């Protein structure tokens, strides 16, 4: 199903979701690659296959193969890291935070795109997955790279809208 068809399938109570999504395309603080990569990464992080396919179909033609792969890598490696580091952050035993993770994360070190773009995508996925430790780590890297608060907030806004779109689509499916 196309993105337009998914958006048209939203019920009246999801009007804000549809309007918020339409405003994402007018976001001026993000580059086109950042915005399109966010759509792909957040679509995957939403765990809604229909939405993930539609967002990738919408964004992929505007992304290089390397950027598309990096956006997917951000979603997949953050799925792992967000679980692991959220555990180390939330566990009552502080010893877990001092132990080595022993998890491969080579895509973080060599994402194939500008580091700031990959970090924005990772931050947004971390926001969807609710890992405060990862959010703080990615936000710090972005700020050190000179990325402004407006762009960081815009990336999280994309994540929030994609997450709400996934829930709205699930509500349609549940009612069917």
Swiss-Prot record:
It catalyses: N(6)-[(R)-dihydrolipoyl]-L-lysyl-[lipoyl-carrier protein] + a hydroperoxide = N(6)-[(R)-lipoyl]-L-lysyl-[lipoyl-carrier protein] + an alcohol + H2O. The active site is at 131 (proton donor), 134 (cysteine sulfenic acid (-soh) intermediate). Keywords: Antioxidant, Disulfide bond, Oxidoreductase, Peroxidase, Redox-active center. It is an enzyme of class 1 (oxidoreductase). The keyword Disulfide bond applies. Disulfide bonds join 131-134. It comes from the Bacteria. GO terms for biological process: cell redox homeostasis; response to oxidative stress. GO terms for molecular function: alkyl hydroperoxide reductase activity; disulfide oxidoreductase activity; hydroperoxide reductase activity; peroxiredoxin activity. Gene3D superfamilies: AhpD-like. Its EC number is 1.11.1.28. InterPro entries: AhpD, AhpD-like, AhpD_core, CMD-like. Belongs to the AhpD family. Antioxidant protein with alkyl hydroperoxidase activity. Required for the reduction of the AhpC active site cysteine residues and for the regeneration of the AhpC enzyme activity. This is Alkyl hydroperoxide reductase AhpD. It comes from Methylobacterium sp. (strain 4-46). The lineage of its organism: Bacteria, Pseudomonadati, Pseudomonadota, Alphaproteobacteria, Hyphomicrobiales.
């Amino acid at each position: 199903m196309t993105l337009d068809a998914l958006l048209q399938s939203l019920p009246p109570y999801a009007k804000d979701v549809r309007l918020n999504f339409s405003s994402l395309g007018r976001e001026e603080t993000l580059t086109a690659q950042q915005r399109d990569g966010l759509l792909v990464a957040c679509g995957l992080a939403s765990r809604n296959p229909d939405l993930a396919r539609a967002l990738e179909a919408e964004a992929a033609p505007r992304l290089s193969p390397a950027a598309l792969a990096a956006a997917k890598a951000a979603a997949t490696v953050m799925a792992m890291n967000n679980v692991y580091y959220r555990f180390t952050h939330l566990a009552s035993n502080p010893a877990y935070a001092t132990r080595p993770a022993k998890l491969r994360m080579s895509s973080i070190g060599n994402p194939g795109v500008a580091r700031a773009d990959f970090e924005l995508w990772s931050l947004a996925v971390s926001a969807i997955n609710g890992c405060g430790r990862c959010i703080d780590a990615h936000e710090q890297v972005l700020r050190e790279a000179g990325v402004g608060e407006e762009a960081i907030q815009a990336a999280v806004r994309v994540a929030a809208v994609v997450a709400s779109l996934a829930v709205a689509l699930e509500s349609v499916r549940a009612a069917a």
